[in-house]
Amino acid sequence: MAVFLATGGGSDPSGPRALTSDEVNRLAMTRFRNYEAHGRAVTITVPGTAGGLIVTGSVDYRRKLGYGVVHGTGRDTSSDGLIEWTATSVAVHPMADAPAHPPASPPRSGWYGRPLQSSGSALDSSLAIALGLGSDRPDNAQLMPQNGAAWWGRDQVDGHRVDIMTGPSSRDRSGTANRVRYWVGSGGTMYRVRVSVGSVSRPVVIDFDTQKYVPVKPVSGVTPTR
């Protein structure tokens, strides 16, 4: 999965600058906050040359399992339906008239499984990124400035005052600092993430708490992390 810097949009023109100690600590905690919450409701906006996709659903950061409903934007409905994914697999349930939100209990049949693609698919890259936004422990705050983490501005997301910061996409991807933007609240809560993937020109946007979190139930063919 290739990850590159997404620039512009919503940041204060005075940025970038080095992070303060408080900002470093909040950025180090932000993925752990998702794990602490067990799961978060998400809306994943995936751009594409032939029209985009929007995934509305939930991610369980303890079990590394996501579940949602997919709708196409600016394209036909051939990709619409339910979706559930892990770090290595994807299961889809096509629906001609997909609901606005996924049902709390997934259908027992009608699912088709496949491996999650590590490259070449903007959707699969977006799903993998969303799963990677949780960690069972805080990131190393001392290493973040060394890896190029920076502050880019202030913004508001659904009434929450946030700082926009760049940093690594996950604990084991320190080289991606300055390539992923996080909208982080005063307590370290993550409200938005924006990142570009190599297969499309516009960034993927992941918004949190866009609807009520619904606990994720595994479907046949998708094995969550224990």
Language-model features, listed with the residues they occupy:
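Solvent-exposed helix/loop surface patches that form functional interfaces
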Residues: 104-157, 221-225
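Gly/Pro-enriched, hydrophobic low-complexity segments
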Residues: 158-225
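N-terminal leader/targeting segments and the immediate start of mature chains
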Residues: 1-62, 215, 220-226
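Solvent-exposed loop/turn segments connecting transmembrane beta-strands
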Residues: 47-53, 73-80, 173-174, 199-201
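Beta-turn initiation residues at beta-strand->coil junctions
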Residues: 44-47, 69-74, 92-96, 169, ...
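Short, hydrophobic/aromatic-rich segments at coil-to-beta transitions
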Residues: 36-43, 62-69, 158-166, 188-193
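Short, exposed beta-strand/loop patches in secreted or surface proteins that constitute
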Residues: 56-62, 81-84, 148-155, 182
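An acidic-aromatic
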Residues: 63-132
